[in-house]
């Protein structure tokens, strides 16, 4: 049975114009030029220090038209992205389209104008008019699936705090290109790869509890008989009594390390990622 979720946590932004591809190529971590028409990828927009001020899914319609699924929980991310657009033939427009998440059986009878396959079990449907679907899931379910897939997210609490590799973007889809040339923050991102400057990675953890910790807060790690705070929570959702977290920590953790939630002492265990963070 398919689960349909209204993804109200996103804005759909159209980027259009003869300079659209060139402009985005100089702004984003992914290789916009070599992204195939009809394809999508996670990508980041960084500040000059290489810290991410937005993280979103980019969809290429053509070299002159792109769509962005921009999370609403960031502070003016679109203003940052279009800061230099005045010097190019490119426009940004928020579209009033329906954004639907699909989990489970991908029903061929649901004909959306754009269908994005996220993985074997999930898709995003984009349509200018309401689709004939019955919503039987919620945003928490979608976030839970994102976390389980190791797909990161940013929020206002973590905006401009991390370079892309700290959230594993080097290992996800086509999120970072190390061969495309210059873009804002590129020097820091390249240094993290070629000089080993990045010492952090994002881990998925789970535990049974009714608590949902705040984004930007810490968990605790056991050191011999003591516990100390560690990491930064970047995503958190409690679904059916199980807490799922994405936490940025040192990338040299031992497999046997024990973790817990400071709020109630609940045991947290590291879950396997569907990709290698050493990519």
At which residue positions do the language-model features occur?
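Acidic, proline/glycine-enriched N-terminal capping motif
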Residues: 1-55, 60-64
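The conserved catalytic core of RNA pseudouridine synthases
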Residues: 59, 67-68, 114-127, 161-180, ...
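Acidic, low-complexity central loop/insert segments
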Residues: 3-14, 54-152
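Anionic-ligand-binding alpha/beta catalytic cores of soluble enzymes and soluble regulatory domains
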Residues: 126-206
């Amino acid at each position: 049975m398919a689960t349909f979720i209204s993804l109200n946590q996103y804005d759909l932004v159209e980027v259009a114009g003869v300079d659209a591809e060139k402009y985005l190529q100089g702004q984003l971590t992914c290789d916009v030029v070599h992204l195939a028409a009809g394809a999508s990828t996670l990508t980041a927009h960084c500040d000059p220090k290489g810290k991410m001020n937005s993280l979103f899914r980019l969809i290429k319609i053509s070299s002159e038209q792109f769509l962005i699924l921009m999370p609403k929980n960031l502070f003016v991310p679109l203003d940052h992205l279009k800061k230099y657009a005045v010097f190019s033939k490119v426009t940004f427009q928020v579209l009033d389209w329906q954004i639907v998440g699909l989990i489970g059986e991908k029903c061929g009878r649901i004909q959306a104008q754009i269908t994005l396959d996220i993985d074997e079990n999930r898709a995003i449907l984009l349509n200018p008019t309401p689709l004939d679907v019955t919503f039987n899931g919620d945003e928490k379910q979608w976030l839970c699936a994102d976390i389980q897939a190791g797909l990161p997210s940013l929020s206002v609490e973590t905006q401009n705090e991390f370079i892309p590799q700290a959230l594993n973007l080097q290992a996800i889809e086509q999120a970072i290109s190390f061969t495309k040339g210059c873009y804002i923050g590129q020097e820091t991102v390249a240094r993290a790869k070629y000089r080993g400057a990045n010492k952090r990675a994002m881990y998925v953890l789970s535990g049974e509890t009714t608590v949902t910790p705040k984004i930007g807060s810490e968990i605790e790690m056991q050191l011999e008989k003591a516990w100390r705070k560690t990491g930064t929570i970047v995503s958190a959702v409690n679904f059916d009594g199980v807490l799922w977290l994405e936490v940025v920590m040192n990338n040299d953790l031992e497999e046997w390390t024990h973790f817990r939630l400071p709020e109630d002492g609940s045991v947290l265990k590291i879950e396997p990622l569907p990709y290698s963070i050493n990519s």
